[in-house]
Amino acid sequence: MHTAIRIGTRQEFDNNHINEMYRLRARVFRDRMGWDIPTIAGMEIDGYDALGPYYMLIQDADRRVRGCWRLMPTEGPNMLKDTFPQLLDGREAPVGRHIWELSRFAIETDGEQTFGFADLTMHAIQELVTFADRMGITRYVTVTTAAIERLLRRTGIETTRLGSPVKIGVERTIALDITVDAIRAAVCKPMPVAA
């Protein structure tokens, strides 16, 4: 499947694609994963979307949004610090201009798998490295599930837990700190040189 992966602010995308992303999030988080989250007109939008985040949109050849990720600096409000501080075991959330938060990862794939992640997801993770290099990001923090943590490790991405797992809703939830270098080492393998 031919895909295009772009990262930009809301203003850099067509409004229809942004709304399609919000609908994808509702399908994945509310419908498929069973999260108890509010939706508006079939779209999952939260207060952090009003703070000028960057979005990764993954689109297929027909320009349909198949996946997304939200990226935000940690210097302002963010999910880990302000919504899920219980995942930090009483410690302060990582904050700094070189530390960004990843949230609202949602994807619909065609079923192709690579080490537990679809090829599409692996390409998206590689784009996180490119974005980090462009923005001077050295670390990402994220609130995710223990299952995703296992998949990251199986892929070879070293992660650091910021606290103990906590059951939130239907998920065993964990906060992770991931260096960009760890992502790069695991998923951005150099191409072999032709002889």
What feature does the model see in each segment?
Residues 52-56, 98, 172-176:
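Short beta-strand micro-motifs in enzyme catalytic cores
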Residues 39-45, 49-52, 78-90:
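Short acidic (Asp/Glu) patches
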Residues 170-191:
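C-terminal "cap" of GNAT-fold acetyltransferases
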Residues 59-92:
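Short, His- and charge-rich active-site/binding loops that engage polyanionic ligands
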Residues 79, 85-173:
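Acyl-donor binding region in acyl/amide transferases
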Residues 51-53, 64-66, 95-100:
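Short connector loops at helix/strand junctions that flank enzyme active sites
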Residues 1-47, 57-62:
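Short amphipathic alpha-helix that is part of the acyltransferase structural core
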Residues 194-195:
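Short, cationic low-complexity segments
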